[in-house]
Structure formats: structure tokens, C-alpha cells
Amino acid sequence: MEKSISSLQQQINAAPLNSEADIESFRLLYTVRKGLIAALFSQLKSVDPTDRPRIGNLLNQLKESAEARIAEAAESISHHEESSQPVIDLTLPGRVSFTGSEHPVQKVLGEMKRIFSAMGFAMATGPELELDSYNFDMLNFPPDHPARDMQDTFFIKRNGNEDDVLLRTHTSPVQVRVMLEEPPPIRVICPGKVYRNEAISSRSYCVFHQLEGLYIDKGVTFADLKATIYSFAHQMFGSDVKLRFRPSFFPFTEPSAEVDVTCYLCGGKGCKVCKKSGWLEIMGCGMVHPNVIQNCGIDPEVWSGYAFGMGVDRTVLLHYKIDDIRLLFENDIRMLRQFTA
């Protein structure tokens, strides 16, 4: 019996315990109820009664030795796993992760919406894929107007005698839809993307953002229009900005004007951006043509109104003193990071 205990002790001492799998195999072989140590305990009753206490003590030592090996191996493996993990120094300062922000076009558009909202304008939107009748006919464009040519407009589908489908060239069709659906008085702004078949340069792009405004009520005058534009320009560009109104022509307004502000780069002295004039155009405007009002089912003898439209992207250039409109569409993260809030 003593030889069996000694032999088993040598096996226990020599058994490799380098992994959790080794420990589990060791436990199943030696320390479980039907293991080798338990088998020796079952033979204890056949030992001479005078030797039984001594042999029983040796068996207990054998069992404790096996359990001690299991505990030591488990602790060693656990310590090794912990030491192999990367140490996190909680005293180090945290890393500031990059956070995105609104695109400069959206930032400026949001400010424009806020200004006009404070003046009482509601917001209206419409489809970018538009019908020829809404984009041209109802806005008093004659059939031979240059804007109807393929060189200026992206036509999606030519339908012969029916309505052509095109990418809208301005957000004015939204004004038409509003006048058809809502009774006056009407006071809305219409922001959105528009498309024109233009050469891409530092000052123009084939797709850009526009915001137009419409006010229909009784007794509306050009003086009301000027007051609105002056208020917007001073809030958007600063109270020291200078404006000028130049006579112009638009099929949907009469009289019509274009509005210029002093150049943001040269302060009115003349540079390449303003083409040495000292002025930059920011919008077109005018009194809504009676034909347009009548086309929308409103009596022009009773109701009058004004409309204006501006390129949001050009306003961004003015606001942030950017000299190339193409930068707004390139998604260059180096440029956009400058606008992180």
C-alpha cells in the first residue's frame, strides 16, 4: 500500500500543469470521487488495523498534495494571463476624439432660416425632379426663353406635347405649389438644391443650394421688399455692409432687381473675386408678376407680393471669405475641420 502511495505521489509531482486543460485532466484523473486517490482510500479497509491510522494519514497527505498542485497551477495561469494583458495607465490624459460638425452650407442655411423665421416666414419644400410647367410655364417664362434650352437645363425626359420632366433650375416651383395650395396671405422661404447645366469654375457649379422667399398680401410694395433684404443682409453680413439694387429682368417679377454687397475680400476696393468692381451679387428680387399670381388662381387686382432668391453657396463664400465654390463640394476633411463646433 505504501509503495502505491509513493508511486502515485511521484506521478502527481511530475504531472505537467501548463494550461487549464492540463488542470482539468489532472483533476479528473486524481481527485474526483472515482479517481486514483479515491481508489486507494477504498483499499484502506483491507489494511491491518494497527497500520490503518498511519496509512490513512499518508493518503490524506497525498490528496492534499494533489489539491495543492491544482491550486498553484490555477493561480500561476491566472497571473500569467493578467500580466499578458496591456496595462492601462489611468493617470494618462484622455484622448480627444474627432467630432464632426455641420457642413458650412448647412450652417449658413440654418442661420438664414433663423433670420427669416424671426421675420415671420414659414418654410416650404418641394421635389427636385420637377415638371416643365411648374419650373417655367407658370412662372411666366416664354416658350423661346434661353433657360429652356438643353445648354442650361438638365432635362430628364422630353414628353413632346406633354409636360417635360427636368431637374429644377431654381426653387421657384415651390412658390407656385404653395400659391396653388394655400390662400393668401402667404409668407414662405423655399430652401433646396437646384441644378443648372453650367461650366464648373471657382464661381459656379452644376448643382448648388438656393433659398427663395415669397410674400403675398394686400398692399405689398417694393419698399417692403427692400426693408426685408436690408434687414437680412445686416444680420447675415454685419451692420456695416453696403448694398445696392440694380435694375434687372426676370420673367416672374416686375419690376426686377439684383442686389449686390461690398466684396468681402477687398472691402469694395476691387479684386479678382469681384472682378475689380468692388461688389458681389447675392440675390435677385422683384415684385411678383401679375401673370404668375393669376396662373396660381389668385386675383392680382387684390393681392400683390414680392419674391427674392439667393444662392446659399455664394452666401457661404461671403460669410466665411472662401474664394472657390468648388471647395464646398469636394468634402476635403482638412477644410471641413475648420468648421468643427
Curated annotation (Swiss-Prot):
Instruction: Respond yes or no to whether keyword DNA repair is given for this record.
Output: no
User: A Pfam family for this UniProt protein?
Assistant: tRNA-synt_2d
Please state what the protein is called.
Answer: Phenylalanine--tRNA ligase alpha subunit
User: Where does it reside?
Assistant: Cytoplasm
What gene, per UniProt, encodes this protein? pheS
Which catalysed reactions does the entry list for this protein? tRNA(Phe) + L-phenylalanine + ATP = L-phenylalanyl-tRNA(Phe) + AMP + diphosphate + H(+)
Q: What do we know about how this protein assembles, alone or with others?
A: Tetramer of two alpha and two beta subunits.
Q: Which top EC class is given?
A: ligase
What cofactor is needed? Mg(2+)
CC cofactor note: Binds 2 magnesium ions per tetramer.
- EC number(s) from the headed UniProt entry: 6.1.1.20
Into which family does the record put it?
Answer: Belongs to the class-II aminoacyl-tRNA synthetase family. Phe-tRNA synthetase alpha subunit type 1 subfamily.
Query: Which GO terms fall under molecular function for this chain's record?
Result: ATP binding; magnesium ion binding; phenylalanine-tRNA ligase activity; tRNA binding
Residues the entry annotates as binding Mg(2+): E254
Species annotation: Chlorobium phaeovibrioides (strain DSM 265 / 1930)
- Give the PANTHER family listed for this entry: PHENYLALANINE--TRNA LIGASE, MITOCHONDRIAL (PTHR11538:SF41), PHENYLALANYL-TRNA SYNTHETASE (PTHR11538)
**What is any one GO biological process for this UniProt entry?**
phenylalanyl-tRNA aminoacylation
Going by the UniProt record, its keywords in alphabetical order are:
Aminoacyl-tRNA synthetase, ATP-binding, Cytoplasm, Ligase, Magnesium, Metal-binding, Nucleotide-binding, Protein biosynthesis
Mind telling me which GO cellular component terms the entry cites? cytoplasm
